[in-house]
Swiss-Prot record:
InterPro entries: Class_I_gatase-like (IPR029062), GATASE (IPR017926), Imidazole-glycPsynth_HisH (IPR010139)
Locations listed in the record: Plastid, Chloroplast
Catalyzed reactions: 5-[(5-phospho-1-deoxy-D-ribulos-1-ylimino)methylamino]-1-(5-phospho-beta-D-ribosyl)imidazole-4-carboxamide + L-glutamine = D-erythro-1-(imidazol-4-yl)glycerol 3-phosphate + 5-amino-1-(5-phospho-beta-D-ribosyl)imidazole-4-carboxamide + L-glutamate + H(+); L-glutamine + H2O = L-glutamate + NH4(+)
Protein name stated in the entry: Imidazole glycerol phosphate synthase subunit hisH
This protein's encoding gene: hisH
Pathway annotation from the record: Amino-acid biosynthesis; L-histidine biosynthesis; L-histidine from 5-phospho-alpha-D-ribose 1-diphosphate: step 5/9
GO molecular function, one term: glutaminase activity
Active-site residues, Swiss-Prot/TrEMBL: 80, 184, 186
Function of the protein: IGPS catalyzes the conversion of PRFAR and glutamine to IGP, AICAR and glutamate. The HisH subunit catalyzes the hydrolysis of glutamine to glutamate and ammonia as part of the synthesis of IGP and AICAR. The resulting ammonia molecule is channeled to the active site of HisF.
PROSITE patterns: GATASE_TYPE_1
CDD domains given in the database record: GATase1_IGP_Synthase
Coiled-coil boundaries: none
C-alpha cells in the first residue's frame, strides 16, 4: 500500500519519509493533484507559516485536490502545519484552511515561544480512550517532541492533549478519516515509531 507524502516545500521530507518506511510502508512523493491517484494514504507534514502553506498548496493544485481527497473518505495524516491547515482559519494569516475542524489556530498564549522539546501527552479523558485511530492505553506515559508557536487550545475532537506553561492544547486530533498531530512523531523516538504503525494500520483499513 503506497503512502503519499505531500511535498509543498514546507516540511522535513527526509525524516518523515524515513519514519514511514520504518513503519513498513512504501513512500511515494506527491507534488500535484494528479499524483494523488497513485496513493492510498496521504501524509502532509509541514513547518512554517499558515498562509504560505495554503498558497503553496494552491500553486500545485493540491489545495483543492486534498479537500476532495478528504471529502471522499480517504485517509489523511497531518503533522504540525499539516494539522493546522485542517482548521478553518489561523491567527497567523488571512488564508482559509481546509475546514475539517471548526476551531481557529491561535498563537500560543505563553511567555516562551516556540514550545520546543519533549512534552508529555495527556490521554486520559473519554475522547482519548475512545479513539478510533490510536490505542493510547498501550502507551500510557507517552512523551513526544514539539516545535511550534501556534496551536489549538481546545477541541471536542482532540484525542490527546499536552500542557505547556500551564496552558493545555491539542496534541492530536481525529475525525473520521483524518488524524493529525501537533508534535513530530518522526522525532519522537520509539513512541513515534509505534504511533506511526498504529495510524498506518488504521489508515489502511479505511
Amino acid at each position: 500500500m503506497k503512502v503519499g507524502l505531500v511535498d509543498y516545500s514546507m516540511g522535513n521530507m527526509h525524516s518523515v519519509s524515513r519514519a514511514i518506511q520504518q513503519a513498513n510502508q512504501q513512500v511515494c512523493v506527491v507534488r500535484s493533484e494528479s499524483e494523488l491517484a497513485q496513493v492510498h494514504i496521504l501524509v502532509v507534514p509541514g513547518v512554517g507559516h499558515f498562509d504560505l502553506a495554503m498558497k503553496k498548496l494552491e500553486q500545485k493544485g493540491l489545495r483543492t485536490g486534498i479537500a476532495k481527497w478528504i471529502a471522499k473518505g480517504n485517509p489523511y495524516i497531518g503533522i504540525c502545519l499539516g494539522m493546522h491547515i485542517l482548521f478553518e482559519t489561523s491567527e497567523e494569516g488571512k488564508e482559509e484552511g481546509l475546514g475539517v475542524y471548526k476551531e481557529q489556530v491561535k498563537r500560543l498564549p505563553v511567555k516562551v515561544i516556540p514550545h520546543m522539546g519533549w512534552n508529555r501527552l495527556e490521554c486520559q479523558n473519554s475522547e482519548c480512550q475512545n479513539s478510533e485511530w490510536v490505542n493510547w492505553k498501550a502507551w500510557p506515559n507517552a512523551w513526544a517532541y514539539f516545535v511550534h508557536s501556534y496551536g489549538v487550545m481546545a477541541s471536542s475532537q482532540a484525542c490527546a492533549t499536552t500542557t505547556y506553561e500551564k496552558i493545555q492544547m491539542v496534541a492530536a486530533i481525529e475525525k473520521d478519516n483524518c488524524f493529525a498531530m501537533q508534535f513530530h512523531p518522526e522525532k519522537s523516538g520509539e513512541f513515534g515509531l509505534w504511533l506511526w504503525r498504529e495510524v498506518m494500520k488504521k489508515a489502511a483499513s479505511l
